[in-house]
């Protein structure tokens, strides 16, 4: 095939990323080798898996390996593998663009502080681009397994905005990356001892042979190769043999994270079912956590043979932040994603892994509450999806939930349902909560007025997932979760007989006003009634017990969902001066304006959106003019 060479532009974000890495990650520059070896190992894993269906892919070179070489005279370090390789389109997709979500958010969060930015960059995942931390030019030669030699591809760039692509003959499959080191890096990195120490530090656990040339006469690399890592599956070793540092390095390998994990669980299960799991909980949420199109899951091995990344069937979506591996002895080597669906072995491993993770979190919450709070701040909103997805573990998940509450009146979500139960008032038989589109909207909601006056704690829920959560978590330890903004407020034994009688008298006295407002508002409301939850506000909106909060209805409508309209109930406080003013209004037209204004204000306070904002403003202006003059 005739060679064809063209110059192409990097995706804009890569340009920025390259410059940031060179400056922010320089203090930990040796991670470039970890990242390149990790990618090479993944390429070999993928070839091993594809070869299960097509053994011819391994023809002529069945021993999968990674080689690290260096040339002091040329000033280069080479990392090569005989894995799956890439074709031209894959090179453009994997090297010329960033396929991850959250790119824009990533750049918005950069602060200019090198230490903080280094952590963010690592959290985003640097991968191949880390080569430019130490190199001023990088060449990549690759050919995909199963393609002819003439379909080789050469990619080359100096990291300044463009790269070249060239077609060439490559006799061997796999990928070779050549780093042309910056002048100032050569003395430090171009030695066998230095490179081996980096490999032993970061990549000892990779279950694949990493080879370097044996050192010959004069300290120069010879012609023979030797394995320089342990090349054993870390998860198969006994826990007592593995140091915390080894666990942390393995986490970085399996997650492509830059920092340490928050905690981990390593288990060997024996009996009717045999498998090993090594599961990590990250300390920081990845940028693609909320990207539903991005695959999430853990690595699946069968008898130490890599089968697939992102095996979503092994953990439910509400635990998608977990990283790690599961190695089974009870699955066939030719297992596919289709076979994983409804597989008994998979179901049992999934169930065991879920219980292990939830147990790990419970132990952390009990023994290390500050550490658990760190976890909650990063992943709490994801865990809130659990009761709706995993009915069998709903109670255990509920014990792990944390909320803001009127007990502290801060937006910190650190109140558990058990904490709430321990503080319940005498005679209280419900767990009260309110949902809103922001913490301040929840905290300042008029629906809380009576409960605050009585000293009854209310959970303040302002995450978008909270409406979903409460619809799937009706009770906790026998106490019903009850919204103070939906249905009639029943305080049960908390209310005295005198209070009930006073309410009945207020209702009777306000019958005429209620009927008049109801007639004025017509079809805009389900009904109008006297409120027993207001003490200082003139009115509030109350929804049906099964209705969705107004702000959630609005969000779903904006997203294009068909939402059936529900009419709110308007509750009024007849003792409020504004209601006294309305009641004394003799002009029916002006009374209707006051009533509409009362409803509009209540809708806004509830987080709803007015159908006619201009009409609302006009009514305010008219009433202000009337009062002024």
Curated annotation (Swiss-Prot):
<dbReference type="Pfam" id="PF00183">
    <property type="entry name" value="HSP90"/>
</dbReference>
<dbReference type="GO" id="GO:0005737">
    <property type="term" value="C:cytoplasm"/>
</dbReference>
<dbReference type="GO" id="GO:0016887">
    <property type="term" value="F:ATP hydrolysis activity"/>
</dbReference>
<dbReference type="GO" id="GO:0005524">
    <property type="term" value="F:ATP binding"/>
</dbReference>
<feature type="region of interest" description="B">
    <location>
        <begin position="338"/>
        <end position="554"/>
    </location>
</feature>
<keyword id="KW-0143">Chaperone</keyword>
<keyword id="KW-0346">Stress response</keyword>
<dbReference type="Pfam" id="PF13589">
    <property type="entry name" value="HATPase_c_3"/>
</dbReference>
<comment type="subunit">
    <text>Homodimer.</text>
</comment>
<dbReference type="InterPro" id="IPR020575">
    <property type="entry name" value="Hsp90_N"/>
</dbReference>
<comment type="similarity">
    <text>Belongs to the heat shock protein 90 family.</text>
</comment>
<dbReference type="InterPro" id="IPR001404">
    <property type="entry name" value="Hsp90_fam"/>
</dbReference>
<dbReference type="InterPro" id="IPR020568">
    <property type="entry name" value="Ribosomal_Su5_D2-typ_SF"/>
</dbReference>
<keyword id="KW-0547">Nucleotide-binding</keyword>
<protein>
    <recommendedName>
        <fullName>Chaperone protein HtpG</fullName>
    </recommendedName>
</protein>
<feature type="region of interest" description="C">
    <location>
        <begin position="555"/>
        <end position="629"/>
    </location>
</feature>
<feature type="region of interest" description="A; substrate-binding">
    <location>
        <begin position="1"/>
        <end position="337"/>
    </location>
</feature>
<dbReference type="InterPro" id="IPR019805">
    <property type="entry name" value="Heat_shock_protein_90_CS"/>
</dbReference>
<dbReference type="InterPro" id="IPR037196">
    <property type="entry name" value="HSP90_C"/>
</dbReference>
<dbReference type="GO" id="GO:0051082">
    <property type="term" value="F:unfolded protein binding"/>
</dbReference>
<keyword id="KW-0067">ATP-binding</keyword>
<dbReference type="GO" id="GO:0140662">
    <property type="term" value="F:ATP-dependent protein folding chaperone"/>
</dbReference>
<keyword id="KW-0963">Cytoplasm</keyword>
<dbReference type="InterPro" id="IPR036890">
    <property type="entry name" value="HATPase_C_sf"/>
</dbReference>
<comment type="function">
    <text>Molecular chaperone. Has ATPase activity.</text>
</comment>
């Amino acid at each position: 095939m005739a060679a064809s060479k063209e110059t192409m532009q990097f995706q804009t974000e890569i340009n920025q990323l390259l410059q940031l890495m060179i400056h922010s990650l320089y203090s930990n520059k040796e991670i470039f080798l970890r990242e390149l070896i990790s990618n090479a190992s993944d390429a070999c894993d993928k070839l091993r898996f594809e070869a299960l269906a097509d053994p011819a892919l391994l023809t002529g070179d069945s021993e999968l390996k990674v080689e690290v070489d260096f040339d002091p005279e040329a000033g280069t370090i080479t990392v090569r593998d005989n894995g799956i390789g890439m074709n031209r389109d894959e090179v453009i997709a994997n090297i010329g663009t960033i396929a991850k979500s959250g790119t824009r958010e990533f750049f918005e969060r950069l602060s200019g502080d090198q230490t903080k930015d280094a952590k963010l960059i690592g959290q985003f995942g640097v991968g191949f681009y880390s080569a430019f931390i130490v190199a001023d030019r990088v060449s990549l030669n690759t050919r995909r397994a199963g393609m002819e030699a003439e379909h080789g591809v050469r990619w080359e760039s100096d990291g300044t905005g463009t790269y070249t692509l060239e077609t060439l003959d490559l006799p061997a499959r796999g990928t070779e990356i050549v780093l042309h080191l910056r002048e100032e890096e050569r003395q430090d990195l171009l030695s066998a001892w230095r490179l081996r120490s980096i490999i032993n530090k970061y990549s000892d656990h990779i279950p694949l042979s990493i080879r370097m040339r044996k050192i010959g006469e004069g300290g120069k690399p010879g012609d023979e190769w030797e394995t320089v890592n342990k090349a054993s599956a870390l998860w198969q070793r006994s826990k007592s043999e593995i140091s915390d540092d080894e666990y942390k390095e393995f986490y970085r390998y399996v997650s492509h994270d830059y920092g340490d994990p928050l905690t981990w669980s390593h288990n060997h299960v024996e009996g009717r079912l045999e498998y090993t799991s090594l599961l990590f909980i990250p300390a920081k949420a990845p940028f693609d956590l909320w990207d539903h199109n991005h695959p999430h899951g853990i690595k699946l091995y069968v008898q130490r043979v890599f089968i697939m990344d992102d095996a979503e069937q092994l953990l439910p979506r509400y635990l998608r932040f977990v990283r790690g591996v599961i190695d089974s002895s009870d699955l066939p080597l030719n297992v596919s994603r289709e076979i994983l669906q409804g597989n008994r072995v998979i179901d049992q491993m999934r169930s065991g892994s879920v219980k292990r993770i939830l147990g790990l979190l419970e132990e952390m919450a009990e023994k290390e509450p500050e550490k658990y709070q760190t976890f909650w701040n990063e992943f709490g909103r994801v865990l809130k999806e659990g009761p709706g997805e995993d009915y069998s573990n709903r109670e255990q998940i509920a014990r792990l939930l944390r909320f803001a509450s009127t007990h502290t009146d801060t937006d910190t979500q650190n109140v558990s349902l058990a904490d709430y139960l321990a503080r319940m008032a005498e005679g209280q038989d419900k767990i009260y909560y309110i949902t809103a589109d922001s913490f301040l909207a929840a905290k300042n909601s008029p629906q809380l007025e009576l409960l605050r006056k009585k000293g009854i704690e209310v959970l303040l829920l302002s995450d978008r997932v909270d409406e979903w959560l409460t619809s799937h978590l009706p009770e906790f330890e026998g106490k019903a979760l009850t919204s103070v903004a939906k249905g009639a407020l029943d305080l049960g034994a908390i209310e005295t007989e005198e209070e009930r009688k006073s309410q009945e008298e207020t209702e009777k006295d306000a019958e005429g006003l209620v009927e008049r407002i109801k007639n004025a508002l017509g079809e805009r409301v389900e009904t109008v009634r006297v409120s027993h939850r207001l003490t200082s506000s003139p009115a509030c909106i109350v929804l049906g017990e099964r209705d969705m909060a107004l702000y959630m209805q609005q969000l779903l409508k904006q997203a294009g969902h068909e939402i059936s309209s529900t009419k709110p109930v308007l509750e009024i406080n007849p003792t409020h001066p504004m209601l006294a003013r309305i009641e004394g209004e003799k002009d029916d037209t002006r009374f209707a304006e006051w009533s509409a204004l009362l409803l509009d204000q209540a809708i806004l306070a509830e987080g709803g959106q007015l159908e006619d904002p201009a009409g609302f403003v006009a009514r305010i202006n008219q009433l202000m003019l009337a009062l002024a003059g």
